[in-house]
UniProtKB/Swiss-Prot annotation:
HAMAP family: Pantothen_kinase_2
GO biological process, one term: coenzyme A biosynthetic process
Catalytic activity, EC: 2.7.1.33
Compartments, record wording: Cytoplasm
Predominant location: cytoplasm
Gene: coaW
Family: Belongs to the type II pantothenate kinase family.
Pathway: Cofactor biosynthesis; coenzyme A biosynthesis; CoA from (R)-pantothenate: step 1/5
Catalytic residue list: E70 (proton acceptor)
UniProt xrefs under Pfam families: Fumble (PF03630)
Keywords: ATP-binding, Coenzyme A biosynthesis, Cytoplasm, Kinase, Nucleotide-binding, Transferase
Name of the molecule in the record: Type II pantothenate kinase
Residues annotated for ATP binding in this entry: 6-13, 99, 121-125, 137, 225
């Protein structure tokens, strides 16, 4: 059995391959000691590590494992998943939305990091908690799905009420810019969280499209744990990507690209 571990800032992603079969699992980073204990029961020759805490894990193993740069591991794993899911792309941007967000260009032979932003899952959870008091990720994302952004976010259609706007009316003119126009209304937790997720999605997409244009590609693959149980984020990112003239790809098990890639490098 081969084991790939991507130890990130919030989650530890684990891929196990044996006899042509693959399993995926996650643990919280706070459970890292338990993961280390489990790894120490395995054959070190079969352990492959990547991510920000890979070096720390490696130091506590009984013997030396293989450690890879997380960007290279994610690129390799994504390449495998894209082909397995029938997407044969010559070049593409891949946007990895974890606690923060990292952007990369790949031409199928090599990857290079082309940008990064602090907007990501960490902002959804942190700002979401400050606004609502909800700390559980699933409860937070479940709640957000039913939110009404129109009373919080100012859209182009709100400005051009009686005339045709020069750009799509569905574009956001100002995130949270409609709040002071609706002080007579109650803002629910769902409304607040939907708007938080929307601003994260719009920033991620804007950055992705910008670097895609810089590298003459229209393909953008979105991966990362922040899309888990978060259809609203997926929809915002997909709609904005299409609106900007690019092709979005969501990859099943994309959050495990780093762990998978570490096995195959």
């Amino acid at each position: 059995m081969k084991i790939g571990v991507d130890a990130g800032g919030t989650l530890i992603k684990i891929v196990q391959e044996k006899n042509g079969e693959r399993t995926y699992s996650t643990r919280l980073t706070t459970e890292i000691e338990e993961v280390i204990q489990w790894l120490n029961q395995q054959d070190c020759n079969n352990i492959n590590l990547t991510g920000g805490q890979a070096a720390m894990i490696n130091e506590q193993l009984n013997c030396e494992s293989r450690v890879f740069v997380e960007f290279d591991a994610a690129a390799k794993g994504l390449e495998i998943l894209l082909e397995e899911q029938g997407h044969f792309l010559d070049d593409y941007i891949f946007t990895n939305v974890g606690t923060g967000t990292s952007l990369h260009f790949s031409n199928g032979k090599a990857q290079k990091r082309v940008g990064g932003i602090g907007t990501g899952g960490g902002m959804i959870q942190g700002l979401g908690y400050l606004l609502t008091g909800i700390s559980n990720y699933k409860q937070l994302t479940d709640t957000a799905q039913n939110g009404n952004r129109d009373i919080i976010d100012l859209k182009v259609k709100h400005i051009y009420k009686d005339s045709e706007p020069p750009i799509s009316g569905d574009l956001t003119a100002a995130n949270f810019g409609n709040v002071l126009h609706h002080l007579d209304e109650s803002f629910t937790d769902a409304d607040k969280l939907a708007s938080v997720i929307a601003v994260v999605g719009e920033v991620i997409t804007t950055m992705s499209i910008t670097v895609a244009r810089e590298h003459n590609t229209k393909n953008v693959a979105y991966i990362g744990s922040s899309f888990h149980n978060n259809d609203l984020l997926k929809d915002v990112v997909k709609d904005y990507t299409v609106l900007r003239g690019c092709e979005p790809y969501y990859i099943e098990h994309g959050a495990f690209s780093g762990a998978l890639g570490s096995i195959h490098l």
